[in-house]
Amino acid sequence: MRKDICAIYAPFHPLTPKYSYKGIFMLLILHPNIQESDPAFKKTMSHLQQLSGVKIKQHEVSGQLQSLREIYLLGDTHALDIEEIESLPAVEKVIRISEEYRILGRHKTQGGRSGFHYQGLAFDQESLHIFAGLCAVDNPKHVEEMLRALQANGLNCTRMGAYKPRTNPYAFQGHGKDCLPWVFDLAGKYGIKVIAMEVTHESHMHEIDKALADAGRPCGVIMQIGTRNTQNFELLKAIGKQSEYPALLKRGFGITLNESLNAAEYLASEGNSQVIFCLRGMKSEFGAPHRNMVDFAQVPTVKRLTRMPVCIDPSHSVGSRDIAPDGVLELCHATAQGVLAGANMVLVDFHPAPTKALVDGPQALTLNELEPFLKDMEIARKAYLERVTVWQDA
């Protein structure tokens, strides 16, 4: 079975109204690297187009080693013979799908490693990437200091907020497109491969794409959808309709986990299955004194229900630099809990001068704390892998 993305079509759900076909869907996984011009593909499509009451939709994802193509049979597929469909020359495997999260979900008959590659990096449920950086871009000096520190510590990913939706209309809203040219130039200078950057409007995607093109595309961008926009369906559709940039979707702070996962499915149903799901805490008085109720215990839950890489955002979950009696920051304890549970990405705020930060300075770690933070997470990651080995051998 191939070791790459295997996309499965969208569920019939209030959040995904685009394809409201009822019944059990059928997924056809085609042989790797097959093209539309291949005789086997043409013969397969000719047969499928003769099926009654079935809609056909194709989806293609380019991995690092393989081009992956899948066909979805939508509608009443109960009467279709799996063995007959599987005998078609372009088909490698056939799967019936009836569960929720049909594109991003984890399905019983589906094997192999899933995920995607972007900018030469693997994003899946086995990897771990640290995205340390500025919650909000403030000035070139601080951005360069941050990126220099990342390079010195062997990191090639970061977070940089150019567009900042704020609860207070008078608070700093970010520099927007004006800062993109020098942010991307500095990213190229310091070997940054991927930047996680929040967008709040479709126009922001176009501004980012233009700025990257003007800079010679020195890095890539993951389009981050913040917790306030988890159910901004027009934004989800816009990001889902393009496949140039992966998406990172934060859990909605006032909705259920199921609703947030279906928002991710909304992205994938539009065609972009390169989605990372981010746990960032839930808005609740029971989380006090933390900023939000830390929800990193649900890292394995999301991995069980879906095939998405799972990110954690300890900065916006904990929201402070409070130190526990053992001398470790509570934020670092929370981060380690998520990594110990198998998190695949950490989105964490750092700043060269937190007291001068324009957004969320009180929760930002300092550059002097970057090295011990990374060592701490390395310990947690090794412990997670050892835990997995213990249970696999049990």
Question: Residues of each region from the PLM?
Answer:
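Non-catalytic terminal accessory/regulatory regions of metabolic enzymes
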Residues: 15-130
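Hydrophobic faces of well-ordered beta-strands that scaffold small-molecule active sites
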Residues: 128-134, 158-160, 194-197, 221-225, ...
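Active-site mouth loops of central-metabolism enzymes
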Residues: 128-143, 169-173, 196-198, 227, ...
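Glycine-rich, proline-tolerant flexible connector loops at the mouths of alpha/beta enzymes
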Residues: 159-177, 350-361
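N-terminal active-site wall of soluble small-molecule enzyme domains
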Residues: 165-220, 232-234
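Catalytic alpha/beta core domains of metabolic enzymes, predominantly
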Residues: 231-350
